[in-house]
Amino acid sequence: MDSFNNLIVVTLALGGVATGNGFNVLHHLAGNSPWFSGPEVTGISSEVPAECTVDMAAFISRHGSRYADNGAYREWANLSSRIHAANFTVQDRALDFLPSWKPVMEYPEQQIAQLSTTGYKELYDMGATYRLQYPDLYAYNTNFTLWSNYYYPSSRVRDSARLFARGYLGPNATELGSIFALNASNPRSFMNSLGSSDLCPAYDDDEGGHHHETWKHIFLPPIQARLNKLIHGDFQFTGDEVYIIPYLCGFETQIMGSSSPWCSIFTEEEILQYEYAQDLRYWYGNGLGTQIEKYMMLPVLDGLVQRFVDGPEATYTTSDTSTFVPPKLIAAFTNDGQISQLAAAIGVFDEETPLPATEISKNRLFKASNFVTMRGTIGFERLHCASEKAGNGTYLRIRLNDVVYPVAKCQSGPGKSCPLAEYQGLVKSKLNSAGNFSQICNVKDPAIPAGQNSATFFTDIALPFQTLVKP
């Protein structure tokens, strides 16, 4: 599997991206990194434990690599305008490109916020990889159902599901595949979509708030001063412009398919400081450092775990009384905010110490770069272990960008997996702690159903707020 997942890294790890000591800038940009298979930080083998089999699997993934959105492109264009209006020279070869730099998007009106060519590749590869990794979970040339957030601002999430389906199903994907795109803004979808926070008025992702800003004010000024000493004339970087340099590195590299010159500007230490800023952004924006934001994907997790508890052969009666047999591989696509919310819910970071805002927490397990990348993926495997040695029973294990992470408070099973029934209990306990979602969200809209605390869309494909999309 690693050969598939590392192909894009090999393609992109060109001059200025991977250094002589093996440090790869693209592995430290959090949500601005193209896909890569995560580092082995837990010491747990990704191989299926002896005498166990995977009889069900699931993943919830961010969309693939994309072009800049409107806000980011405006920042790029404004920076380019300032550069070209100035008269200056540079004193470092790493900045030689600067006087002539312009944004790499050739057709911004059409490309804004859409998947890039690297995104296409990531998703096709992902489909083929999952087909090879779990050959027993799909019968050749049969129908396959998957899900996506509809996400009205852009088609990139739906397109990610479409491209995955083509890689997974092959030439007959359009005939065999059915993608149910969930409209997270429809009141009837409250806590029953892949964008649960959309209908929560109290939800407020402040992008890390004062923790994020405190760290930016510590680490950015020295970088700004260092760079501006290398520029002579009437151009100087602002602090905000310095902060988007790693963003430009990640985006330009995957858009062009070759190393961006922006990747050579920050030192290794400075990149790690930027990476920590991104950790603060997610931890305190919509992760475990928040009050209600961390709960938003719990209903989806609860519905997914119930599907695992019901087992691979379960059938369901949908809301229109038809019968639905879900796939043994549950595939779903959404956005980075939901990946961060889900990471807060799954239990692998529950014993992490809150991240300080004034210094880097060097021994932290939580690194957004390892799972909120483009095509960042939180995966689940249901392990059926048939022998006493393997611990007779059914277990669950979690994989972030391929790497197995143990549940902090439940790792008694083979390969530090968690007994499935115990994991369901843990999720139910989290739901109880969260309370009534209508109340914590301060819902006032009478069209929003009360008491909806668990997602049903994985087992009901007749819901009124979903749209069928074909690959």
Where are these regions (language model features)?
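Fungal secretory targeting signals
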Residues: M1-G22
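Signature for phosphate-centric chemistry
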Residues: T19-W147, Y152-I330, T334-P471
